[in-house]
Amino acid sequence: MTQEELDALMNGGDLENLEALETKEETKEEAKEEAKEEAKEEAKEKEEIKEESSSQKMTVKKEDAEKYGKISPNEWPPPPPTEEHKVVHQLDDVTRDSEVKATQIFDQLDLIGASAEKIAKMVKKIQEPLQKHQEIFDNLHGHFPHVESFKTALNEQQEILNALKSIEEEAANCSDSSMQAMDIMQFQDIHRQKIERVVNVMRALSQYMNSLFEGKIDDSKRVSSATFITGDDDKDLASADDIEALIASFGAK
């Protein structure tokens, strides 16, 4: 009987009031128990979610580790420092290969520009005699306007000169485009310089970290690390109780 029930009886309360108080008290207890159960379930769910997320981040597939393939950024540890995963090596390869390919592209653009200039010179050589022929046919057509062959030859000569002029213009456009392409290719040299700057910063940072963690004792003379320290959680090791039980079993035999 609670203090409230005792006070009710002392004040002359009847049994109905007493039962009402008991019912109210039981309801409070049940509400408290339900709240505790809900809090426990929520805490358990949060713990499970945390364990799942941590296990996903710390998982590495065995086949990925064996073949040193691509590893997801959410997995740990990162790829081993093999030749294909060394960052500075890859950046050096990029700068070297891009410089070689850029040189080849410049050579091809230079060849295109030189060929366009040759075409323009050849067109000029052809135009000179054709212009003289046009003057001749023009005089003939002026003196003999009724001769149809002179008129036809004059028109054909004019069409040839117009075609040569178009070829000369296209050759000039080709030469200008090759020069513009060479100017645009200057971005490759700028990118190479940026990559080299990044490589130099990374190398300086690597040397700084090596100097920062450098020790006075040589690695060959340094004491090896303990495989197990008291307090570590390792199921493969026997505890003190297991050892005592084993000794006791030998004594019993």
From Swiss-Prot:
UniProt biased composition (Basic and acidic residues): 21-69
Q: E.C. number, please? A: 3.1.3.-
- Spell out the molecular function terms from Gene Ontology: phosphatase activity
**Effect in UniProt of substituting D189N:** Complete loss of phosphatase activity. Migrates poorly through the soft agar
Q: Spell out the InterPro entries in the cross-references.
A: CheZ_Pase
Similarity section: Belongs to the CheZ family.
User: Main role?
Assistant: Plays an important role in bacterial chemotaxis signal transduction pathway by accelerating the dephosphorylation of phosphorylated CheY (CheY-P). Also dephosphorylates CheV2 but not CheV1 or CheV3. In addition, forms a distinct chemotaxis regulatory complex with ChePep independently of the core chemotaxis signaling proteins.
Q: NCBIfam families from the entry?
A: Phos_CheZ
From the Swiss-Prot or TrEMBL record, give the protein name: Protein phosphatase CheZ
Q: Which organism is it from?
A: Helicobacter pylori (strain ATCC 700392 / 26695) (Campylobacter pylori)
